[in-house]
Swiss-Prot record:
The organism of origin for this protein: Pogonomyrmex rugosus (Desert harvester ant)
Coiled-coil ranges (or none): none
Protein name (record): Myrmicitoxin(1)-Pr6a
Propeptide: 23-24
Main location: secreted
Length: 52
């Protein structure tokens, strides 16, 4: 269980970090797709944990 919690913690930190880093880029219209990819990272990690 500790491993799962570690993955979730990393996912949350990565999600928050990518959100902070992506904020200045929202002024450019081409950056929206990259931000959506960052938003999907925690979902992918959770999917990998559930289906492993």
């Amino acid at each position: 269980m500790k491993i799962i919690y570690a993955f979730l913690l990393i996912a949350v930190v990565a999600f928050m970090g990518s959100g902070i880093m992506a904020e200045p880029l929202t002024d450019k219209p081409g950056q929206a797709k990259k931000i959506r990819i960052f938003d999907r990272i925690p979902e992918l990690i959770n999917w990998m944990i559930v289906n492993h």
